Amino acid sequence: MSDPCECFFDHESAMQRLLAMLRNSQADCTDTGCDNDGLSREGGNTMMMWTLLWTFMAMALYVMRPNSMRSDRRTADDAAIEKPTGSSDDNTPPPPPPSAM
């Protein structure tokens, strides 16, 4: 089963598909050369549209990212909130470890 369509079509249908593909290729190409490069104009245009769409979506997501993902300079208040420092009193004992009970 080298042909995936072999499960659905018999040998005669496969030959008809092959002949149809050959006839279609003869309309595009002759013995001396081909009229087009093998890609239809719509195919190349569609690829360009998809590329532009993905680029636009990536730029929109980058611009609308939340503040937590931005690497802007943070103020001293923000740094104090994110990285707590020890208390100013050095004589306080550390908190007791959690009990196993």
From Swiss-Prot:
This one is known as Small integral membrane protein 14
Compositionally biased spans, kind Basic and acidic residues:
71-81
Region annotated Disordered, chain positions: 71-101
Q: Which domain of life is it from?
A: Eukaryota
Q: Which Pfam families match?
A: DUF2615
Q: Which portions of the chain have biased composition (kind: Pro residues)?
A: 92-101
Its Gene Ontology cellular component terms are: endoplasmic reticulum
Matching entries from InterPro entries are given as: Uncharacterised_CD034/YQF4
